[in-house]
From Swiss-Prot:
Name of the molecule in the record: Photosystem I iron-sulfur center
InterPro entries cross-referenced by the UniProt entry: 4Fe4S_Fe-S-bd, 4Fe4S_Fe_S_CS, PSI_iron-sulfur_center, PSI_PsaC
GO biological process, one term: photosynthetic electron transport in photosystem I
Gene responsible for this protein: psaC
TM spans (from-to): none
Role noted for this protein: Apoprotein for the two 4Fe-4S centers FA and FB of photosystem I (PSI); essential for photochemical activity. FB is the terminal electron acceptor of PSI, donating electrons to ferredoxin. The C-terminus interacts with PsaA/B/D and helps assemble the protein into the PSI complex. Required for binding of PsaD and PsaE to PSI. PSI is a plastocyanin/cytochrome c6-ferredoxin oxidoreductase, converting photonic excitation into a charge separation, which transfers an electron from the donor P700 chlorophyll pair to the spectroscopically characterized acceptors A0, A1, FX, FA and FB in turn.
Membrane topology value: Peripheral membrane protein
Co-factor binding comment: Binds 2 [4Fe-4S] clusters. Cluster 2 is most probably the spectroscopically characterized electron acceptor FA and cluster 1 is most probably FB.
Gene3D superfamilies attached to this UniProt entry: 3.30.70.20
Locations listed in the record: Plastid, Chloroplast thylakoid membrane
C-alpha cells in the first residue's frame, strides 16, 4: 500500500519522529529554517508501514509530520494543522 509522508515547516528539528520510526523512513537533513538547523525528511517513504508512530512522537502543537494512508484524504482527526 502506498502512503504519503508530509513534513511541514513547523518541524523544530528535535529528531523524535526519526527515532520513533521502526522502518527508518525518516532522516534529518540540513535546513536553515529552524533553530536546530535541521528538518525531518522522508527519503524512504516506500518503506512506510503506516503505523503513525512519527505523528505520536511529534512534540509540536501543530503536527510537523503526517502520514496519509493510501487514498486517505487530509482530515483533522481533532488536530490543528
Amino acid at each position: 500500500m502506498s502512503h504519503t509522508v508530509k513534513i511541514y515547516d513547523t518541524c523544530i528539528g528535535c529528531t523524535q519522529c526519526v527515532r520513533a520510526c521502526p522502518t527508518d523512513v525518516l532522516e534529518m537533513v540540513p535546513w536553515d529554517g529552524c533553530k536546530s538547523g535541521q528538518i525531518a525528511s522522508s527519503p524512504r517513504v516506500e518503506d512506510c508501514v503506516g503505523c503513525k508512530r512519527c505523528e505520536t512522537a511529534c512534540p509540536t502543537d501543530f503536527l510537523s509530520v503526517r502520514v496519509y494512508l493510501g487514498a486517505e484524504t487530509t482530515r483533522s482527526l481533532g488536530l490543528a494543522y
